[in-house]
Every structure is written in structure tokens, then in C-alpha cells.
């Protein structure tokens, strides 16, 4: 693998992914990232089939409103920017969101995965948040997305000294592979030695 600046193979990684701190704090935010925003979570075309396959497993967990949206338009739609995203209820909640007794939002797909009912964790864009993957010419761009609803996660990440890329090790490996992540860690260590991050 070739690393130049902050590039690993055909992936350009924002310095913010390496230097900013982040650690989800569900007790504080209650899973707000799954219910706020103007569109659903980005979905890769290959994930549509997985989302449809998991529906019978999670159907009873979903709200009646979410089931109605899925019946009417499916598990995904194309947003105003032309991207495939998860369907949403009332222009905010992802159709796969559920709530526990404390009012904390959780993903019905992830819950089913943790219970051993499916081998699909959830869309990779959800797993990667607050990282967003975009296109940058012939390259993939790995960017840190700042959002006010995640202030508590930033504070906890700073307190515990957890960089974004370390917090998201598992989903980064899921997306790009073990070797790629090992190169990312090496690049981060070298940049830290040089005082770049």
C-alpha cells in the first residue's frame, strides 16, 4: 500500500478523522443521529437486498408508521441529491429506528444482529458515523462529519482521548479491510510523531 500525505491506496482520509476525538454517548444523546436530519442514512446499492432480507426478522420491532412507509415506498429512496438513503418516517426518523423504555433510540437491525438473528449488522454508513464516505474524483474520501447532536460524543472522546479513527476501527475494517486499517494506524502514528496531528 502506498501512503502519500493522507492517502492510502485510492482512499483520501481527512486529517480530522485522525486528530478529532469522538466516543458515542448514548446516555446523553439518546441516539438522536438516527432521528434527526433531512434524509435517511446513505445506503450502498448492494445493501438494499440485505435490508429487504432482514425485514421479516425485525418487522414486529418497527413502528406502524415505519411499516406503512416501507409498504408504500420500500426500504430506500433517492434523496434530493440523487443518493440512495434509508426510508424515513415524517421526514425524520429512519424506518429502522425503535425506542427502549428510557426513550433511547436504537437500530432494529443492529439489535437483531446482536441477538444472532441476522448476519447483517446495519448499513455501513450508519456503522461508520460520524465518518461519511464520498467521492473525490477517482478517489474515495473519508471525512469527519460534525453535527451538533453529537456534542456529548465529542466531549467524551476528548475526555477519554479517543480519535475518530480508533472509535470507528471495526466499521473502517468492515469497509476497507484489515490491511488498509493497519496502514491508517501507521500513517496516524507517523503524523503524530511529526506533530501533524
PLM features: what roles do these ranges have?
Residues 4-197:
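Short loop/turn segments that flank or connect secondary-structure elements
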Amino acid at each position: 500500500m502506498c501512503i502519500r500525505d493522507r492517502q492510502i491506496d485510492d482512499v483520501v482520509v481527512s486529517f480530522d478523522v485522525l486528530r478529532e476525538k469522538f466516543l458515542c454517548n448514548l446516555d446523553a444523546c439518546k441516539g438522536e443521529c438516527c432521528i434527526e436530519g433531512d434524509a435517511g442514512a446513505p445506503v450502498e446499492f448492494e445493501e438494499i437486498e440485505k435490508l429487504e432480507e432482514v425485514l421479516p426478522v425485525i418487522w414486529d420491532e418497527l413502528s406502524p408508521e415505519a411499516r406503512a412507509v416501507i409498504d408504500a415506498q420500500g426500504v430506500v429512496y433517492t434523496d434530493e441529491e440523487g443518493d440512495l438513503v434509508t426510508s424515513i418516517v415524517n421526514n425524520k426518523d429512519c424506518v429502522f429506528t425503535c425506542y427502549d423504555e428510557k426513550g433511547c433510540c436504537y437500530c432494529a437491525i443492529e439489535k437483531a444482529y446482536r441477538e444472532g438473528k441476522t448476519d447483517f449488522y446495519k448499513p455501513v454508513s450508519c456503522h461508520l458515523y460520524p465518518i461519511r464516505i464520498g467521492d473525490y474524483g477517482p478517489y474515495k474520501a473519508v471525512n469527519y462529519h460534525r453535527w451538533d447532536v453529537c456534542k456529548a460524543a465529542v466531549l467524551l472522546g476528548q475526555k477519554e482521548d479517543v480519535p475518530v479513527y480508533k472509535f470507528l476501527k471495526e466499521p473502517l475494517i468492515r469497509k476497507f479491510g484489515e490491511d488498509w486499517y493497519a496502514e491508517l494506524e501507521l500513517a496516524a502514528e507517523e503524523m503524530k510523531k511529526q506533530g501533524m496531528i
